[in-house]
Amino acid sequence: GAYFDGFDVPCVPRRDDC
C-alpha cells in the first residue's frame, strides 16, 4: 500500500499516504 522503509504497508501512523 504505502511504501515505508522499502516495505509495502497498508496504513501506518508514522508515514502514511492514504
UniProtKB/Swiss-Prot annotation:
- Disulphide bonds annotated for this chain are C11-C18
GO molecular function term, any single one: toxin activity
Q: What is its main location?
A: secreted
What name does this protein carry?
A: Conotoxin AusB
Q: In which tissues is it expressed?
A: Expressed by the venom duct.
> Which function does this protein serve?
Does not show any effect on voltage-gated sodium, potassium channels, and on nicotinic acetylcholine receptors (10 uM of toxin tested). Does not show antibacterial activity on both Gram-negative and Gram-positive bacteria.
Superkingdom to which the source organism belongs: Eukaryota
Q: What else is known?
A: Negative results: does not show effect on Nav1.1, Nav1.2, Nav1.3, Nav1.4, Nav1.5, Nav1.6, Nav1.8. Does not show effect on Kv1.1, Kv1.2, Kv1.3, Kv1.4, Kv1.5, Kv1.6, Kv10.1 and Kv11.1/KCNH2/ERG1. Does not show effect on muscular (alpha-1-beta-1-delta-epsilon) and neuronal alpha-7, alpha-4-beta-2, alpha-4-beta-4, and alpha-3-beta-4 nAChRs.
Alphabetically list the UniProt keywords: Disulfide bond, Secreted, Toxin
What family is this protein classified in? Answer: Belongs to the ConoGAY family.
What the entry says about domains is: The cysteine framework is C-C.
Q: Where in the cell is it found?
A: Secreted
Its GO CC terms?
extracellular region
